[in-house]
Regions:
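Conserved non-transmembrane functional hotspots
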Residues: 1-219
Length: 219
């Protein structure tokens, strides 16, 4: 009996040790994932800078002028000088997704979609193309879903409001990173909200990708 009890204790001890070891490995992977997530937000700083410049540009007016005037297009090229979206190292961030909470990933996706949309806006003006290519409605819908309490502000200021809500999205990402590090689990409401945000950010990214593809075909 004593021998059996010793064997059971040894098994329990081994199982507990294995569990602790697995949890430690998982925590380390989550730590790496949140570092990747926030690191990518930092990497997107040049695109955020473009967003800041685009916040003061009236899309329809600027597009109309850029289509007619080469000098206007040159001004926008100067505004974007030094910015190359292809050099932003953000592709690997998808590897972090399984290790961060759904809402942390959703807020990041919304943030990335909005700043990259601003860079597409600039590209359209640099080429002297129609403002119809820039789908501001999808950005509006994305922000209303991600930050529903800001709906009145978004309705009042329209596209000019987009950039000024990025700081709040950054804060939301940081809050969710803290929750991940504290080991908090996502509740049903958070998971459902994350799904809605991701749906809208995916729609925006798909819209931008389709427009860019159309531009490449026309060239």
């Amino acid at each position: 009996m004593q021998s059996k009890a010793s064997q059971i204790d040894a098994l329990r001890s081994g199982a507990l040790s294995g569990l602790i070891s697995r949890q430690a490995v998982l925590y380390e992977r989550r730590l790496k994932a949140v570092e990747q997530l926030w690191g990518t937000v930092v990497t997107l700083a040049p695109a955020k800078h473009i967003s800041a410049m685009m916040a003061v540009v009236k899309l329809d007016v600027a597009s109309e002028k850029a289509q007619k005037d080469l000098q206007v297009r040159e001004v926008f090229k100067i505004m974007g000088s030094g910015f190359d979206i292809s050099k932003l190292q953000i592709a690997d961030i998808s590897k972090a997704r399984p290790f961060v909470s759904p809402l942390a990933w959703a807020y990041y996706s919304a943030y990335a979609a909005i700043v990259l949309h601003a860079s597409f806006f600039l590209d359209v003006l640099q080429r002297g193309l129609s403002s119809d290519l820039v789908d501001t409605e999808k950005v509006t819908q994305l922000l209303k879903v991600a930050l529903p309490h800001q709906e009145a502000y978004i309705e009042k200021y329209g596209p000019s409001a987009f950039h000024y809500l990025l700081e709040e999205l950054e804060s939301k990402i940081l809050i969710k990173i803290d929750s991940i590090l504290e080991g908090k689990q996502s509740d049903t409401e958070s998971i459902e909200k994350a799904a809605l945000i991701l749906r809208e950010s995916d729609r925006l990214m798909e819209s931008n990708a389709a427009s860019k593809h159309g531009l490449e075909i026309d060239q």
